[in-house]
């Protein structure tokens, strides 16, 4: 019986390189690529979590949900997101983080689209909670990438660069959703 979790397996080791110059060149290029990908990727994933905060007023004004109901929906995301970050961090340590992160973003995007098909409170609470779970794939994969590619002495600097993604994502949310 096929194991669906094999998709997330970290894969076989690459062959060992002996040429020091080639190793240094490849390592430097890979590190730059890693920091750019995790920063841009997380920045683009962030709006999938913030979209509800932008559309709350129209939902209330349209009589679709009350402020209390939106509070329940929003709480579902944050409670499940917190738990997801905790548990998904353990999973990310042993997973192919490219696939793990991409799956989280893809499922989160699909959930955001699915929310437009219903105005039932319980459906929104469940979907927004699931969105929180899959959003919880993001930060752990970024942390794993940082710890795999940057030394203890460098992590603060590169974590600072990566943390720009939160602001980029928040700005993107208002650019894309608000108009």
Task: Please place each PLM-identified region on the residue numbering.
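Short hydrophobic/alpha-helical segments at membrane-entry points of transmembrane helices
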Residues: 120-128
């Amino acid at each position: 019986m096929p194991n669906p979790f094999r998709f997330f397996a970290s894969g076989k080791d690459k062959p060992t390189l002996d040429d020091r110059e080639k190793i240094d060149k490849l390592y430097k290029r890979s590190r730059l690529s890693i920091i750019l990908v995790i920063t841009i990727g997380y920045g683009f994933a962030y709006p999938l979590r913030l979209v509800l905060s932008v559309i709350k007023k129209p939902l209330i004004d349209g009589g679709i949900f009350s402020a209390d109901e939106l509070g329940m929906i929003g709480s579902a995301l944050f409670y499940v997101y917190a738990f997801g970050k905790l548990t998904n961090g353990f999973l990310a340590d042993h997973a192919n983080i490219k696939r793990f992160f991409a799956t989280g973003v893809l499922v989160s995007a699909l959930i955001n689209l699915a929310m437009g098909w219903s105005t039932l409170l319980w459906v929104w609470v469940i979907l927004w909670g699931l969105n929180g779970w899959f959003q919880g794939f993001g930060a752990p994969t970024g942390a794993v990438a940082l710890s795999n590619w940057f030394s203890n002495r460098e992590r603060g600097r590169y974590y600072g660069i990566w943390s720009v993604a939160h602001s980029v994502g928040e700005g993107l949310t208002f650019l894309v959703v608000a108009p």
